[in-house]
Amino acid sequence: MIGRLHGIIIEKSPPEILLDVGGVGYELQLPMTCFYELPAVGQEATIITHFVVREDAQLLYGFNTRQERTLFRELLKANGVGPKLALAIMSGMSANQFVSCVEREDVSSLVKLPGVGKKTAERLIVEMKDRLKGWISHDLFTPYTDAAPVDHEPSLAPADTVESEAVAALLALGYKPQQASLVVSKVIKPEMTVENVIREALRSML
């Protein structure tokens, strides 16, 4: 089991990064809410991980805090929720926002997430409400304290590259091609980074 990785980010392709750890490159997928907080390419990062083994693949999912990973694992326990849907849910809203939606039984907000219909939203609330009780009040979602201070400032890419990468990220999270292209075209502005475009796109759909 791989529980934590510390290395240098050598590639970013939302929602995936390539992390160099002692000369070995690890591919990790992160919720966009975690991706936004990553340092720039070329800098060190500490990633809390969840390892998934399937018949056809071995996958690593990354998080900034152990508590975010705990929420991911709690989502996986819910009926009908796999890693891809859990990743999409945690990309569409922060951990605190999701817990708040569950506590308030806010079906209307949950159904705006990709892959979450009314029945899935209702099931998530029923299955997770007791397990998540008190998470926000205990302030569990705090940054991983072992991580060194980092520069989060990303470098700007050409506008067409930013747009295509933002659309690709939304597709990877489960959004439909037409929806992804439309929302990105609406929110993109000059000088925006890929992460900024994705953040605004996801925010506009909630």
UniProtKB/Swiss-Prot annotation:
Q: Does the keyword DNA damage apply?
A: yes
According to its UniProt record, where is this protein located? Cytoplasm
Q: Where is this region: Domain III?
A: 158-206
Q: Name one GO cellular component term.
A: cytoplasm
Q: What is known of its domains?
A: Has three domains with a flexible linker between the domains II and III and assumes an 'L' shape. Domain III is highly mobile and contacts RuvB.
Share what the entry says about its subunit structure, partners included.
Answer: Homotetramer. Forms an RuvA(8)-RuvB(12)-Holliday junction (HJ) complex. HJ DNA is sandwiched between 2 RuvA tetramers; dsDNA enters through RuvA and exits via RuvB. An RuvB hexamer assembles on each DNA strand where it exits the tetramer. Each RuvB hexamer is contacted by two RuvA subunits (via domain III) on 2 adjacent RuvB subunits; this complex drives branch migration. In the full resolvosome a probable DNA-RuvA(4)-RuvB(12)-RuvC(2) complex forms which resolves the HJ.
| Family indicated by similarity | Belongs to the RuvA family.
The name on file for this protein is: Holliday junction branch migration complex subunit RuvA
What are the leading ranks of the lineage? Bacteria, Pseudomonadati, Pseudomonadota, Gammaproteobacteria, Aeromonadales
Originating gene: ruvA
